Amino acid sequence: MINNIFIKIFLVFLVCMSAIYFGYQYYQNSKPVITIYPDELPTKIKPSIIENNQIAAVHSTIYENLIAKDTNIKTVKLLPDPEKPMSIDSRNQSQSDESFDEISNLIALIEPNNNAKNETDLNIIKLEKGSKDKVSNAKNCKNNESYKVQLGSVKSEAEAMKEGERIKKQFPKILKNVVITTKKVKYDDGKFFYLILAGDYGSLSQAKAVCKKLAYNKQSCVLK
């Protein structure tokens, strides 16, 4: 008897739940389907005049020009691909150092030959005694002329020598058998600083070749 009551209650509950479920599905299916259409409004809506006040730039057409238009593919210009970054290889750098060494060696060989050729092509002119002394002094000054390269500047002489030796060890091939010296220079306010100099070099071309090799290796260099 009790079992029959429970079965009847369960059946009634099941019928009610089924009715609610199917009623909800029917309600959902009876709703209209929402369809989204393209917006036909202009890109820019021009505001109206408020209290006889004209809004600035109300007639600007910049937004209208942004509207996508049909583009002819034949009129499109394609930009070239960007350049690829340079790849720096240590092997290429060593080869460049060797080429610099060869260039400096060639310059050192060509320079004396040119000087000797120029001396032989000079016309012989007889000079007075006083003129001979002036020419002799000028020639001695020219022979004693030398060039140095500036590697940097610091505040003390000891620091200058230390930094110069460090740079010399860093570039043993370029600064081989070079004497590091310092030069005291005065500021406008009375203070002093010291230049780090390497040399002497017998010709300007030789000093320039050394500076080019140092600059290639990212070391500051100035001819003095």
From Swiss-Prot:
Keyword line: Membrane, Transmembrane, Transmembrane helix
GO molecular function, one term: peptidoglycan binding
Gene Ontology cellular component terms for the protein in this record: membrane
Source species taxonomy: Bacteria, Pseudomonadati, Pseudomonadota, Alphaproteobacteria, Rickettsiales
Residue span(s) of domain SPOR: 141-224
Positions in coiled-coil regions: none
PROSITE patterns assigned to the protein according to its UniProt record, in alphabetical order: SPOR (PS51724)
Transmembrane segments: 5-27
Superkingdom to which the source organism belongs: Bacteria
Subcellular location: Membrane
Pfam families in the record: SPOR
Membrane topology: Single-pass membrane protein
Record InterPro entries: SPOR-like_dom, SPOR-like_sf
Record-given protein name: Uncharacterized protein RC0096
